[in-house]
Design a protein with these regions (language model features):
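Short, surface-exposed loop/turn motifs at beta-strand boundaries within globular domains
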Residues: 19-21, 129, 140-142, 157
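Short, low-hydrophobicity acidic/polar segments
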Residues: 34-140
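Surface-exposed interaction/gating patches
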Residues: 139-155
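Sparse, context-dependent recognition of short Cys/His-centered cofactor- or disulfide-binding micro-motifs
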Residues: 11, 130-134, 223
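Short amphipathic, basic-aromatic surface patches that mediate peripheral association
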Residues: 1-19, 149-154
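Tryptophan-paired
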Residues: 24-79, 158-257
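Structural beta-strand/beta-sheet cores of well-ordered domains, especially the beta-sheet scaffolds
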Residues: 134, 143-145, 162
Length: 257
């Protein structure tokens, strides 16, 4: 028995597993929801277009679950799994830091891409030695945002004059890829730099000119964004402020995810 992973829930609608996924951790649970087998693989072997993971399982019914992209727990940590642990125990949590001045947790890293997958399989008796291959679709649980701030008047902008952040409660993901109740998390930039953009400026009643101006560019990576009941939860917001704390923009970022 073999399992193939597929990540085609992306803008290109093409399988990008070999290009984006660097590690795989697979769990198999029996019909009682107990862990009976797990395996890890990472590195160059995943980049081969024909990669599959061998399922060292006896014939029977199983629920397979995968967290991919953990990369030694550099960005996310999954609960330690021991034999007979329950499927519901295997949740995944964002590594975060505590801002002692505000008491609010934050992340300022370019998070390693995280993926989740699940699949129910029935493995038949394989007395004839045949090969059975199953396909697990993956969902990406991280998002990278590149924010470009420019002045409509054509005035240059200094990136060092602004702060950018995204606020949400989405750093704790359950075994079924839903969000668990979590504390507020502020995602800070991991890269800011100055860029250039062309701005169309009116020079008269019927004439305009395109001028190159400096813009501020910020990059942030966040955990899983999902639609929720906004009467119960606060919307995840992109917040832009001046260094003096003046609010420049507050944007519901999930509308652009």
């Amino acid at each position: 028995y073999h399992l193939k992973f597929r990540y085609d829930m992306n803008m290109k609608f093409a399988d990008a597993f070999t290009h984006e996924v660097k590690s795989v951790r697979l769990y198999a649970f029996n019909s009682n929801g107990e862990l009976v087998w797990q395996a890890d693989e990472q590195g160059e072997i995943l980049a081969s277009g024909d990669y599959t993971m061998k399922l060292e399982l006896a014939p029977g019914d199983y629920h397979l679950m995968a967290w991919c992209g953990l990369d030694n727990g550099e960005s996310f940590t999954v609960t330690d799994a021991s034999h007979n642990c329950r499927m519901t125990d295997l949740h995944c949590k964002l590594n975060r830091y505590l801002d002692k001045a505000t008491g609010v947790s934050y992340s300022n890293k370019d998070l390693h891409p995280l993926f989740h997958g699940s699949l129910d399989v029935s493995l038949p008796a394989n007395d004839d030695g045949g090969d059975y291959t199953y396909v697990m679709p993956l969902t990406k649980d991280t998002n990278v945002f590149r924010v470009v701030l420019q002045h409509l008047s054509g005035q240059d902008i200094n990136v060092d004059d602004f702060t950018f952040s995204i606020e949400d409660r989405n750093g704790w993901i359950a075994h079924d890829n839903t969000l668990k109740e979590d504390e507020p998390i502020v995602y800070r930039t991991w890269s800011t730099y100055s860029g250039e953009a062309g701005v169309d400026i009116a020079t008269g009643k019927e004439s305009r000119v395109t001028t190159i101006v400096k813009v501020a560019v910020a990059e942030l990576t966040v955990s899983r964004l999902v639609l929720r009941d906004w009467s119960l939860y606060s919307r995840p917001m992109l917040i832009i402020r001046t260094n003096e704390g003046k609010l420049v923009a507050s944007i519901p970022i999930i509308d652009y995810a």
